[in-house]
Amino acid sequence: MRLPWELLVLQSFILCLADDSTLHGPIFIQEPSPVMFPLDSEEKKVKLNCEVKGNPKPHIRWKLNGTDVDTGMDFRYSVVEGSLLINNPNKTQDAGTYQCTATNSFGTIVSREAKLQFAYLDNFKTRTRSTVSVRRGQGMVLLCGPPPHSGELSYAWIFNEYPSYQDNRRFVSQETGNLYIAKVEKSDVGNYTCVVTNTVTNHKVLGPPTPLILRNDGVMGEYEPKIEVQFPETVPTAKGATVKLECFALGNPVPTIIWRRADGKPIARKARRHKSNGILEIPNFQQEDAGLYECVAENSRGKNVARGQLTFYAQPNWIQKINDIHVAMEENVFWECKANGRPKPTYKWLKNGEPLLTRDRIQIEQGTLNITIVNLSDAGMYQCLAENKHGVIFSNAELSVIAVGPDFSRTLLKRVTLVKVGGEVVIECKPKASPKPVYTWKKGRDILKENERITISEDGNLRIINVTKSDAGSYTCIATNHFGTASSTGNLVVKDPTRVMVPPSSMDVTVGESIVLPCQVTHDHSLDIVFTWSFNGHLIDFDRDGDHFERVGGQDSAGDLMIRNIQLKHAGKYVCMVQTSVDRLSAAADLIVRGPPGPPEAVTIDEITDTTAQLSWRPGPDNHSPITMYVIQARTPFSVGWQAVSTVPELIDGKTFTATVVGLNPWVEYEFRTVAANVIGIGEPSRPSEKRRTEEALPEVTPANVSGGGGSKSELVITWETVPEELQNGRGFGYVVAFRPYGKMIWMLTVLASADASRYVFRNESVHPFSPFEVKVGVFNNKGEGPFSPTTVVYSAEEEPTKPPASIFARSLSATDIEVFWASPLEKNRGRIQGYEVKYWRHEDKEENARKIRTVGNQTSTKITNLKGSVLYHLAVKAYNSAGTGPSSATVNVTTRKPPPSQPPGNIIWNSSDSKIILNWDQVKALDNESEVKGYKVLYRWNRQSSTSVIETNKTSVELSLPFDEDYIIEIKPFSDGGDGSSSEQIRIPKISNAYARGSGASTSNACTLSAISTIMISLTARSSL
């Protein structure tokens, strides 16, 4: 649809001045979709959706089969917010193809087409069907013949009023509705009824029954399969769709159905087989699923094959859509839309809903549209259509043509433009105008003419090079086109240039030093100046790297850089950059940092022997200070970190890159590294060399701490410390144990072929108890035998004592302590005695659970503590030595005394007089099961002293002579034959400045009350107040 020229001009001006999001052409939010409407629906209303946005609000029209729908002439039609409502829809009048059209002042767009169809299912016309007569064993087809309908159908059959099930002998085609029986049996005789269901309306109708009877003229013989249900030769299938192929055969015996691809490829695993293989279903169909498929029906009489080609198709799908374009008059427009699909889509173009063809300035080639020298008549709504036989898609865009005179309202010339003397400046002139204007410049009131210094570009910008002071002033840009003239003025200010007076200079420094790189300038003081520094091309971040870098100077014309604690990583190029609003310049300096050498490279083991390794390496960077020496370090699995090693030459100078490491252990895996040094310091070590093992050699190190002793009767036990693996010098390491009776000449030898052996036991009845032997242990490996250790004397195992101790006696010391006495055995022992073992147990316990304590040497008594009071204990004593214990003495019994009193002294009162402290307390009475109180112990100490003094008394008072210049801590407890009883709470008597004082401890009637009191209240009063 073509709009009036005046409306387009007005639209262009409004579009130019308004926000793009405010005014625009129609845009579909929702387009109509196909509708299958059930004729028997109770709703009696159809809605075709069409939702559009635009400003101004678009007007919506509908077309049916290309003809406008007149909603005013037919009350059944109404348009609500763009969507078309049809009341009481009629199959004859309303079925067809609908399309929505949207129009506003910017143009017109049309929607995709949508079909309205009516779903229905009529009743069967006939009420009876002829009887079908077949032989037993014969195949049979019962025709359904569905009545007139619209919408997809599904089929089922009823056999004698019951649903007919499907198996390998029966099949219902969902394409034709027919019932197939591969081989009729006697049980198949009866009435068959076809049931047809419309899947849209769910309406169901039953056909007339068909009687099936068996003929009496014989049984059908065997015959090969005959395929009655087969899929078409070509089955086009959409991408992503689900395709179902049917195949069923009659035959005797009942045929089996097998599916396969003719090209030999396996059928996709996603495929499913139904109804005894009668249906092959392939979901989510893709290009790789296309091909020739075969259905093979086979029985013992033969086989038949049905074939069909599954072809792949895809509706068009956008790869590239078109977008809105806003252009000035006389410019060019190019649109391109791209879609994929199968078959390949073709393209059409619409302008304002009407076909667009190639003519004059408009060139169309497939998905491209080219409009040259655009004018106002080209404005409108454009649509690109991509179409193949399976569908069509739309892409919509708006072409806005701007026609307006020059306007500087949003793009005024810069009010002030700064430039330095000798510099170059461009004053931009960018008014909004369509078509493109012609530009003129003035300086002051004079027209500016171009010369070799002053030029005006095609887009209107003014360029001046080699600026002088005389170029300063006001400049005006004048823009003119068909629709008017406009101008804008700005000022050019010329400033003196900035110059670096003290640039940074290259320096040579040592690691750890600090320096200042100067950067001082002269500049126009009316301009702000900014200093920045870069290091090796990267700006220095003074916040992040403040540990090393700091800006110093203190003047706006100085931007010096201080570098503190310089490291090797700080070597490189430093650039001071100075910037004002009119110029930018820089000055650079190189910083050389001298430091310890870098790590040497490529440390290689050239040759290795049993104790030496020949190494070579390449020097690393010397960091600007010659390397003076190298040190070689080694590491083994047995060393703690890296260790310096001896070399030849002993001192390796900086010009030597090979050395021999000496003093290595044979048959040990080594790795080496090299460290370089110069006058500044020691550098980082090299990467380790490869690991190499030294060659084998005879062992040289003998076992340490050769000793022994102990063991069982007639045994000589010899022990030693194993030789560390790094000192074994080779594989097959072991020990040679040599021993002989003391004073004899001939050695007995035993070989132990284990590097881990550390003990040998010689057992022989001829070995006397505790007799001396000379012992030494040697070493060997695959290379041969090594030395023996020094000879040492080891005693054979001794015999345990043979006689028991005598005269056992025990007595009770308290409720918790017993003392036991015994005498040495009366008869001579064959085994020496190293001490005695006392065994004790309670009467109610078993002897095997007894506790034991040991004495050492000739001690013939011991004290047993931590026992229970009033308990009967049994005791026995044995002599022992390293071979074990001897026979037990006779058992003696002893009963511990009653426990001491559990109640502490209570009601403690104290007073002081003439350097004395007098304590009084209540008498403690023992319980029936406790020992009688024999007296009391008073324990006292200075508050700062750890040692305690004790006074015993059989009274309930005591007098202490103590100086008053210290605080005292005092406790009181009873004692009895059963031991010491419970102690009172501690009483603190403070340092007393007055000669007379009185106080009391907590009053306690039992132990529980005493333990619950956490503080002691002390009151002091002068004697005069008593």
UniProtKB/Swiss-Prot annotation:
Which residues of this chain are annotated as glycosylation sites? 65, 90, 191, 370, 375, 466, 705, 764, 858, 893, 911, 929, 954
Q: Name one GO biological process term.
A: regulation of synaptic plasticity
Domain Fibronectin type-III, which positions? 599-697, 702-799, 804-899, 900-995
Would you say which domain of life the source belongs to?
Answer: Eukaryota
Prodomain residues: 1001-1026
Give one GO molecular function term: cell-cell adhesion mediator activity
**Bias category Polar residues: which stretches?**
886-896
| Result of changing residue 176 to P | In a colorectal cancer sample; somatic mutation
Q: In which tissues is it expressed?
A: Mainly expressed in brain. Highly expressed in cerebellum and weakly expressed in corpus callosum, caudate nucleus, amygdala and spinal cord. Also expressed in testis, pancreas, thyroid, uterus, small intestine and kidney. Not expressed in skeletal muscle. Isoform 2 is weakly expressed in cerebral cortex.
Q: Might you report a single GO cellular component term? A: synapse
Region entry Disordered, spans? 685-710, 886-907
Establish whether keyword Disulfide bond is in the entry.
yes
* Lipid-attached positions, GPI-anchor amidated serine: 1000
Which InterPro entries has this protein been placed in?
CNTN4_Ig6, FN3_dom, FN3_sf, Ig-like_dom, Ig-like_dom_sf, Ig-like_fold, Ig_I-set, Ig_sub
| Disulfide-bonded cysteines | 50-100, 144-194, 247-295, 337-384, 429-477, 519-576
Q: Briefly describe its induction.
A: By retinoic acid, suggesting that it may act in response to differentiating agents.
Which N-terminal residues, if any, form the signal peptide? 1-18
What is the protein's major site of localization? membrane
Q: Where is the composition biased (Basic and acidic residues)?
A: 687-696
Q: Which residues form the Ig-like C2-type domain?
A: 32-117, 122-207, 225-311, 316-400, 406-493, 497-586
The effect annotated for residue 420 to N is: In a colorectal cancer sample; somatic mutation
What does the sequence similarity comment in the record state about its family?
A: Belongs to the immunoglobulin superfamily. Contactin family.
* Description of how the protein assembles with itself and partners: Interacts with PTPRG.
What is the protein name given in its UniProt record?
Contactin-4
